[in-house]
Structures are given as C-alpha cells and as structure tokens.
Amino acid sequence: MSLSAKDYEPNWSSLDSRPTPQWYKDAKFGIFIHWGLYSVPAWGPKGSYAEWYLNGLKSGDSTRLKYHAENYGKDFPYRGFIDLFNPVDYEPEQWADLFKQSGAKYVVLTSKHHDGFCLWPSAESKGYNSVNGAAKRDLLGDL
C-alpha cells in the first residue's frame, strides 16, 4: 500500500474529491471496533449510540442522566470510568485470530473517541489513557 500526500481545502467539494483507495475497494470486508470508557456503562436510550454516553450527559439528556444517577450516582464523573475500565479477559491474539478467520481484510479500532480517552499511552493524553487507568496496559499496541 502506498500513501501520497495531497492538500485538501476545508470544504465538502475538496474532501469529496479524495479517491477511494484501491485496497479499500478490493478489501470488501473489514471490522470496526468501538471500545473505550463508554464500554463501562455500555448503555444508551433506544435509538441512540452507547458510544455517545458522555455527550448525552453533557447535553443534559434526561434519560441518560437518570440512568447514570441510578447506576453510578449523581456525582460520579464520567472520568471515573477510567478506574472501572479493566478488560481483564482481553486476549488480543484471539481477536486477531478471529478477525483473520472471518476473512476481514482490515480492522479499525477507535483508539481515541470523542471523550479523549486513549487506548495507548499517549504523551498528549495527560494520563487519561488505558495505561494509567485500571487496565494498566497499551490496549491498542497489544492488538
């Protein structure tokens, strides 16, 4: 696979002019994984995404706020999930074997979602990452 740099303007016309890479067209099947602190509550109201748990709390979504208060306490901060996100049964080698057996040609892991929590020891995360949390490991690097 070769990558080439090209400048794009911050508008849809320019961004839409990007060609789809041939390898992506040929791959046909890949796996996308959303995994992070939002996996602790792993909950969202019907019709919403659990990955946007923090956004729901910040926006004042009454259903999400009620769920959060009932399950974690009204004053429990979202960042508190760093001490609860501890995937002790995470076996990245088994994941990789399963991906290969499935015929997937690529895997995309949300190594940092909208909440800013990193699944690797980023120097820019100010400690807000899996190595400094309960997991105590580089979840991205292990995969």
What name fits each language-model region?
Residues 2-143:
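Mature catalytic domains of secreted/periplasmic carbohydrate-active enzymes
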